[in-house]
């Protein structure tokens, strides 16, 4: 089996160059699960001093850069916060959201808070269910069904999400602004 980085070494070099230019502290490695997937790992503090320091993994799907469905949000680069874990944050804020929206789960889902935080999705990862940042809204997606976004652009988008998430958790912006998605 040939992985995307073996069959398209030029794309691999471009991915590495983009990450080294914009996120030089991130390191690339291969998943130890036998899947052949590559990932980047590093920390960012997008809100600046006093903000949360996020330990992040950017995981390439083996189909990179091909996107096979318009529902494949985020393209082929998945953003997994290791610390803080989104699942932990979501579980902490969900009771507040439930109270705010009078325990109306249909309304909570319509408002975009079905998992407790806006613009996240859950997926099995190893032995755990983890929450990932949805790293691209289809209307802002930099790519198409032929070419996916790069890790650098996915992480840039995720950093904007992290800033707004922190502001929302601190009560600095409203639910509506947090859900708008124009980050």
Identify the function of each model-found stretch.
Residues 1-183:
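UBC/E2-like fold recognition across ubiquitin and ubiquitin-like conjugation systems
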């Amino acid at each position: 089996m040939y992985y995307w980085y073996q069959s398209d070494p030029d794309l691999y070099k471009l991915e590495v160059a983009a990450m080294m230019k914009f996120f030089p502290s991130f390191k690339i490695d291969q998943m130890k699960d036998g899947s052949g997937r590559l990932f980047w790992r590093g920390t960012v503090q997008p809100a600046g001093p006093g903000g949360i320091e996020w330990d992040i993994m950017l995981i390439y799907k083996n189909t990179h850069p091909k996107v096979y469905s318009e529902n494949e949000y985020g393209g082929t680069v998945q953003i997994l916060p290791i610390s803080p874990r989104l699942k932990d944050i979501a579980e902490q804020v969900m009771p507040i959201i439930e109270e705010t929206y009078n325990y109306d789960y249909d309304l909570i889902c319509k408002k975009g808070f079905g998992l407790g935080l806006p613009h996240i999705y859950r997926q099995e990862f190893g032995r755990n269910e983890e929450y990932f940042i949805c790293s691209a809204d289809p209307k802002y997606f930099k790519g198409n069904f032929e070419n996916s976004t790069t890790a650098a652009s996915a992480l840039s988008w995720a950093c904007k999400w992290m800033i707004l998430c922190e502001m929302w958790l601190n009560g600095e912006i409203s639910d509506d602004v947090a859900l708008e998605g124009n980050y």
